Amino acid sequence: MELFELTLHELHDKLAKREVSSVEATRALLARIEATDSRVNAYITVTPDEALAAAEAADRRIAAGGLTPLTGVPVALKDIFVTRGIRTTCGSKILGNFIPPYDGTVVAKLREAGAVIVGKLNQDEFAMGSSGESSAFGATKNPWNLACIPGGSSSGSAAAIAARSATATLGTDTGGSIRQPASHCGCVGLRPTYGRVSRYGVIAYASSLDQVGPVTRDVTDCALMLGAVAGHDPLDSTSIDLPVPDYAAALTGQVKGLRLGLPKEYYLEGLDPDVKRALDAAIETYRGLGAEFVEVSLPHTDYAVATYYLIATAEASSNLARYDGVRFGHRAAGAANLIDMFRRSRAEGFGAEVKRRIMIGTYALSSGYYDAYYLKAQKVRTLIMQDFMKAFEQVDALLTPVAPTPAFKIGEKVDDPLQMYLSDIFTIPVNLAGTCAISVPAGMSAAGLPIGLQLIGRPFGEETILRAAHAFEQATEWHRHTAQL
């Protein structure tokens, strides 16, 4: 087995036994990036010099007895996390040359743990997208089929895992942006409860919906990554001050007696036959493991996509007002005056999808429409939250599809925003409710593309869904399938 093929926990074990050095593992991964990324385009920026220096420091730390689960492990970050001294673009021309002067909290935590950051990953521009096609740095390709999308917006985070060009990655999830690409690329992707992980130093899209989470090769790696980045942060006012459990200790493999809910609104006509087949098989696997199933209802599901696209775009309209060409980012040349410079900098710097969402959000917040659109959407969001809380009175977790179809062809939906937005129909409600969910590999389509299942937990119920995902993983072989590049 090549070093780049090792999972995080397998590499950790080899580092602990001194069977391999961090420098060796990092060199192997950098060579893998060099060999694959011209085809996959998972990375925007690769940092070999910084990575090798960090690997050398990690080897010294290991020799001194300072090993943590992440020490010496090469990881990569979605290009939405500010990284001191390393270009951070958020997939946009407007930040094409932005080099932050500080690290975001999760980046600082990874560095403190001794992780080796090898680069910044491609994404939909400002995390606005479901396919990885809206990046100013070119579309990311799905390693399972280079003609297909990897999902978005954390496209590079999932594609790098599938291509074995990162040992573990971090992404963000605003409406499904971790879980959907994880499903399409055959990875494990976790969106933690809102407030579980600090957002300080995450470039904002929709502040009440954004959350940081890991994309990994298996559930054990996911638990280790979450444990490294979770926790209260005084720099993030929405961060929750709760103890961080030992997530890896929750992976007992036992789900006997676990009550899993099947929301009837998620199992309707129109679900892709391959997805339905994978979900039916997963349900039978869980039955065999001793889990119990209960039909539940989330009656306001039909309103989730419309609600999300009003709230998220309204928040984006506000958050992206800061990009004006004055203090940082792209500045248009030859402007006649200050107002002209604002207009031209934004017109040149933002892509089409970002402009579309800014306009929708500005309209929803405008005088005369605020009550009819934004305020009503917030009321419906409360109803969606209540739906989940009622469901969790009956069950421990929910089992649903992640996406209505496997990965589609690049360019197939780019001219049909509504169809693109509906790609997240099963993931968006979780973000509106603020709770946690995980995508885990559960099957393959007839065309050889991965399919994931989604486990949704109650707020701060990450241990439960990790345990359930791990039990499924142990009972199946889907996570062992690898893309052939």
UniProtKB/Swiss-Prot annotation:
InterPro entries: Amidase (IPR000120), Amidase_CS (IPR020556), Amidase_dom (IPR023631), AS_sf (IPR036928), GatA (IPR004412). Its EC number is 6.3.5.7. The active site is at K78, S153, S177. One of its GO terms (biological process) is translation. Signal peptide: none annotated. The keyword Phosphoprotein does not apply. It catalyses: L-glutamyl-tRNA(Gln) + L-glutamine + ATP + H2O = L-glutaminyl-tRNA(Gln) + L-glutamate + ADP + phosphate + H(+). Pfam families: Amidase. Disulfide bonds: none annotated. GO terms for molecular function: ATP binding; glutaminyl-tRNA synthase (glutamine-hydrolyzing) activity. GO terms for cellular component: glutamyl-tRNA(Gln) amidotransferase complex. Keywords: ATP-binding, Ligase, Nucleotide-binding, Protein biosynthesis. It comes from the Bacteria. It is an enzyme of class 6 (ligase). Heterotrimer of A, B and C subunits. Belongs to the amidase family. GatA subfamily. Allows the formation of correctly charged Gln-tRNA(Gln) through the transamidation of misacylated Glu-tRNA(Gln) in organisms which lack glutaminyl-tRNA synthetase. The reaction takes place in the presence of glutamine and ATP through an activated gamma-phospho-Glu-tRNA(Gln). HAMAP family: GatA. This is Glutamyl-tRNA(Gln) amidotransferase subunit A. It comes from Geobacter sulfurreducens (strain ATCC 51573 / DSM 12127 / PCA).
